[in-house]
Each structure stands twice: as structure tokens, then as C-alpha cells.
Amino acid sequence: DWKPENAKKVANAGINKAGHNFDAILASNDGTAGGAIQALIEEGLAGKVLVTGQDADLAACQRIVGGTQSMTIYKPLKKLAEQAAEYAVKLAQRRPVIATGAYDNGQTQVPTVQVEVVAVTKENLKDTVVADGFHPADAIYR
């Protein structure tokens, strides 16, 4: 389960095993990054260890500004939705959709259209998440 409390337990166990001898935590999403950061806070390591997540959750953006989370992966939802709608219409009209890659699902190569994602840091937060209207600046910078 991608729950913050589970991530905190896993991070606590990892810290107990590694001590302070590690550089980064690559979390599956921003919620689990938040759980891992709670473990880091308990050990006095928050802001000293690189922590990544994905989804650009509001809390993650606030942690990025605060210095406890290094980055998040942002997927521009408006662009994704527009592209998905365009492809759905094409498929409904039996028009071709050009795959830009393929994904091996273990049984076959599935044609895939990959969409560019953005690594969001303190330096580009305003130009990405805020500029797209995903989160308002006053909610992030409080």
C-alpha cells in the first residue's frame, strides 16, 4: 500500500539498518515521500537527505519550499487530459494513433504514447505547478 504510514515504517527500518549512511529516498509518490520525511524528521535528517516523490501534491510542494523534499514529478494533467481525449476520439473514429514507444507488459509490447513529465524543484515550482494553475502560489508559499 502506498500509504504515508507504511512508508514511514519502511523508512524507519531502512534508517535503523543503514544508520545515517545513505543519500536519498526515492518514494513512489508524494504521500509516501511525506511518510519517509516523517521518519527523517525523527532522526534529525530532514533536509539533509534527498527525497523525491511524484504527483506534485500540495503538501509536497510545501515541503519542497520548506526544504524537506527535494523534488516531485509533475504530470501536466490538462495536457494529459487533452491528449487522451484527442486519442479517444481518433480511436472512436477508427483513425490511427501513432505510438511514440512501447511498453513490455511481460507478454507483449504494448504500443505507448509517452508524455513528458517535469521534475519540479524549488527553483522551477512557480514556472510549472503554479503557472499551470495546478496549485495557487498562496497555498504553497504560506
Where are the language model's segments positioned?
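Short, charged, surface-exposed secondary-structure boundary motifs
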Residues: 60-63, 81-85
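Hinge/cleft segment of the Venus flytrap/periplasmic-binding protein
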Residues: 83-142
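Short, well-structured alpha-helical segments in soluble
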Residues: 5-21
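Venus flytrap/periplasmic-binding-protein-like
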Residues: 26-30, 34-69
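Short beta-strand elements at the ligand-binding edges of bilobed clamshell
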Residues: 66-78
